[in-house]
A protein has these predicted regions:
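Helix-coil boundary and N-terminal low-complexity module in membrane systems
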Residues: 1-100, 107-203
């Protein structure tokens, strides 16, 4: 029964997350709230999905939105670089292309970390980004696991129309919350190393 209850919680959480992302600009705050709730679920804490989601959404709205806009600008910039570089066929540009892929992987890793960081720790936006960079490299095995999962999802989206449709359907039911829950299992292990003894510094 507990397993079934958790499945229903993840479905409910997924629907709330999708609803909260509709304005698009709110995706950052919604992602931080999603991470906040799934980490609580992993730890067996406060089970109130609706209340906890909107609590975190409100608390991290400004910070989450700022980081979300920043991340969009970063990936637009990287996309433009790829567009320019892919039109060149020299060896130099081939090397630059490889380096650019490395930058993309690092940027993606940082943004996988930063929303959970702001949802769990009280810190400035700059410090949150610094912490995300530090954790990206400081916990490389966990980072690689998250990148593989993210890469697999992106691959399925690009593989064929059928697999893309499958990803869309699953995402609409429970995909976002399930992936966030899996990531939160990893974040639980990571964050415990940085949590202060005093609860005042943790949301």
């Amino acid at each position: 029964m507990e397993f079934i209850a958790k499945i229903f919680d993840l479905i409910l959480l997924n629907l709330i997350f999708i609803f909260s992302c509709v304005p698009i600009i709110t995706i950052g705050a919604s992602t931080s709230a999603l991470s906040y709730v799934t980490l609580k679920m992993v730890r067996g804490e406060d089970p109130y999905i609706w209340q906890n989601f909107w609590k975190s959404f409100r608390q991290n709205f400004k910070q989450g939105t700022l980081i979300w806009v920043f991340s969009i600008l970063i990936f637009i910039f990287l996309g433009m670089d790829f567009y320019i570089i892919n039109s060149q066929n020299t060896v130099l540009f081939a090397v630059i292309r490889i380096l650019l892929w490395c930058v993309c992987l690092v940027a993606l890793s940082v943004f996988l970390y930063v929303f959970p960081v702001i949802s769990h720790f009280v810190c400035s936006t700059t410090q949150a980004l610094k912490n995300a960079v530090f954790m990206t490299f400081g916990h490389l095995p966990y980072t690689l696991v998250m990148l593989v999962i993210t890469g697999l999802i992106l691959y399925l989206c690009a593989c064929s129309v059928k697999t893309f449709a499958l990803v869309v359907v699953i995402s609409g039911i429970c995909g976002f919350s399930v992936v966030a829950f899996i990531y939160s299992i990893l974040f639980d292990r990571i964050f415990k190393k940085y949590e202060p003894k005093s609860p005042d510094n943790i949301e």
